[in-house]
Amino acid sequence: MRLIFLGPPGAGKGTQAKHLTERYGIPQLSTGDMLRAAVAQATEVGKRAKAVMDAGQLVSDEIVNEIVSDRIDAPDCAKGFILDGYPRTVPQAVALDRMLEEKNLKLDAVIELKVDEAALVRRMENRVAETVAAGGTVRSDDNPEAFRRRLQEYREKTAPLSEHYARTGRLKTVDGMADVKTVTAEIEKILA
């Protein structure tokens, strides 16, 4: 099972991916985690990524695509994977399609969690309040202003992926505002 989760920050992608990882025994592939692992393991592409990051620049699509390609080849991805945070742009999606085709693999579904942005901001504020009340540490980007910037970036760069995958017939939409169990049940129906 090969999946992509789409949706803005705070939509519940990580929560749903964790459930599917446990249920189906497939890894959740986070771009950030893959990048850090490639750098730590000093792979060829990891060395190139490190040089770019050390120079204070953004890692190119070419390098990110290569890191994803290498990760998909890992033994734990034999039964499938869930991509989280990749692709972020239509050019990355096109590269992923080409990459999977070359490996004789296909995406089973692209699941978009549709959410109300104002409700997302409230959800984030509640999460911060609960974390603080429990004595936990709050992420630096978990404040309303930073969160709104992340939503704006999502709208500009990542939201066009919905149209791309809708054109290919692979996009499935789920109401991400429902409770976690309901969202999980809807995703399970799509995957059945």
Curated annotation (Swiss-Prot):
<feature type="binding site">
    <location>
        <position position="127"/>
    </location>
    <ligand>
        <name>ATP</name>
    </ligand>
</feature>
<feature type="binding site">
    <location>
        <position position="178"/>
    </location>
    <ligand>
        <name>ATP</name>
    </ligand>
</feature>
<comment type="pathway">
    <text>Purine metabolism; AMP biosynthesis via salvage pathway; AMP from ADP: step 1/1.</text>
</comment>
<dbReference type="GO" id="GO:0005737">
    <property type="term" value="C:cytoplasm"/>
</dbReference>
<protein>
    <recommendedName>
        <fullName>Adenylate kinase</fullName>
        <ecNumber>2.7.4.3</ecNumber>
    </recommendedName>
</protein>
<dbReference type="Pfam" id="PF00406">
    <property type="entry name" value="ADK"/>
</dbReference>
<feature type="binding site">
    <location>
        <position position="36"/>
    </location>
    <ligand>
        <name>AMP</name>
    </ligand>
</feature>
<keyword id="KW-0808">Transferase</keyword>
<keyword id="KW-0547">Nucleotide-binding</keyword>
<feature type="binding site">
    <location>
        <begin position="10"/>
        <end position="15"/>
    </location>
    <ligand>
        <name>ATP</name>
    </ligand>
</feature>
<dbReference type="InterPro" id="IPR027417">
    <property type="entry name" value="P-loop_NTPase"/>
</dbReference>
<dbReference type="GO" id="GO:0004017">
    <property type="term" value="F:adenylate kinase activity"/>
</dbReference>
<dbReference type="InterPro" id="IPR033690">
    <property type="entry name" value="Adenylat_kinase_CS"/>
</dbReference>
<feature type="region of interest" description="LID">
    <location>
        <begin position="126"/>
        <end position="142"/>
    </location>
</feature>
<comment type="function">
    <text>Catalyzes the reversible transfer of the terminal phosphate group between ATP and AMP. Plays an important role in cellular energy homeostasis and in adenine nucleotide metabolism.</text>
</comment>
<keyword id="KW-0545">Nucleotide biosynthesis</keyword>
<feature type="region of interest" description="NMP">
    <location>
        <begin position="30"/>
        <end position="59"/>
    </location>
</feature>
<dbReference type="GO" id="GO:0005524">
    <property type="term" value="F:ATP binding"/>
</dbReference>
<feature type="binding site">
    <location>
        <position position="150"/>
    </location>
    <ligand>
        <name>AMP</name>
    </ligand>
</feature>
<keyword id="KW-0418">Kinase</keyword>
<dbReference type="InterPro" id="IPR000850">
    <property type="entry name" value="Adenylat/UMP-CMP_kin"/>
</dbReference>
<comment type="subunit">
    <text>Monomer.</text>
</comment>
<feature type="binding site">
    <location>
        <begin position="85"/>
        <end position="88"/>
    </location>
    <ligand>
        <name>AMP</name>
    </ligand>
</feature>
<keyword id="KW-0067">ATP-binding</keyword>
<keyword id="KW-0963">Cytoplasm</keyword>
<dbReference type="GO" id="GO:0044209">
    <property type="term" value="P:AMP salvage"/>
</dbReference>
<feature type="binding site">
    <location>
        <position position="139"/>
    </location>
    <ligand>
        <name>AMP</name>
    </ligand>
</feature>
<feature type="binding site">
    <location>
        <begin position="57"/>
        <end position="59"/>
    </location>
    <ligand>
        <name>AMP</name>
    </ligand>
</feature>
<comment type="similarity">
    <text>Belongs to the adenylate kinase family.</text>
</comment>
<feature type="binding site">
    <location>
        <position position="31"/>
    </location>
    <ligand>
        <name>AMP</name>
    </ligand>
</feature>
<feature type="binding site">
    <location>
        <position position="92"/>
    </location>
    <ligand>
        <name>AMP</name>
    </ligand>
</feature>
<dbReference type="InterPro" id="IPR006259">
    <property type="entry name" value="Adenyl_kin_sub"/>
</dbReference>
